[in-house]
Amino acid sequence: PFCQSGMTIMGMTSGCPLHNLVPEWNDLVYTGNWEQAYNRLHKTNNFPEFTSRVCPALCEKACTCGHWGSPVSVRDNEHGVIETAYANGYAAPKPPKVRTGKKVAIIGSGPSGLAAADQLNQRGHEVTVYEREDRVGGLLMYGIPNMKLDKSIIDRKVNIMKEEGIHFVTGYDVGKDIKPAELYKKYDRVILCCGAKNPRDIKADGRDAKGIYFAVDYLTQNTKSLLNSNLTDGKFVSAKGKNVVIIGGGDTGNDCVGTAIRQGAKSVTQLEMMPCPPTERAANN
């Protein structure tokens, strides 16, 4: 692959929304320079420990090698880089050497809130992150099932961020527990990273029937109960023994499928508006 020479041609990096320097750190992996590979990866990606587990690997869809064979296994390589970094101390806490004296409040500790906190802290600002839930992570913590993203991975990174000087305040609902005017007095800047909390609903006969749940509510209750009591507190919606219908075939819908199956659902049917993908390549393709 061209990655082995560190070259970037055609659309080799266009698939990554973060514009990761994929050929560069793939070349460094190829030559065994793992610490340099981590440094190049971390230059554009604050959280490779998350993306290497849950990212849909758009980089592999854009990989030039995929035109005539299999694409480079970029996500697996990324996972190897970050876990090697943890194992060898490359990902150890690195507090900023100089503080600016500026104070920033970030509302929300999901992916965008954590990324903003990390970037601003690296620049020497004093950062405090407010989270309404009882744990840091937003949808990373409660919207993605533990089977897909083990929550110890999130805690590992958050603990490093704490050692680097970032403050986290959980169980604090801005607007209720503290007024925006108070934040403006305490901080030089306030950044809103609240996420999209309003689910997409449908208009259909029987929509108000019992037993219908929004996906994130279903997933959140299950993960909370798992973390708090290993599913012994009964504070979650159980699909055990039930015939389950899931509307939506995206990542969240698939997470609901996996959760329902693990809970022991009698049957699971998934509805998707898009046409079913082909099971084999067409003769003229």
Segments from the language model and where they lie:
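Ferredoxin-type iron-sulfur electron-transfer modules in oxidoreductases and energy-metabolism complexes
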Residues: 11-14, 18-53, 68-98, 223
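Detector for the c-type heme attachment site
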Residues: 4-8, 21-22, 60, 64-68
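Residues forming the flavin
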Residues: 78-285
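Hydrophobic or amphipathic alpha-helical targeting/insertion segments
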Residues: 56-68, 186-193
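Residue-level signal for mature regions of secreted extracellular proteins and peptides
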Residues: 3-5, 9, 48, 56
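Residue-level signal for short amphipathic helical patches enriched in basic/charged
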Residues: 32, 58, 263
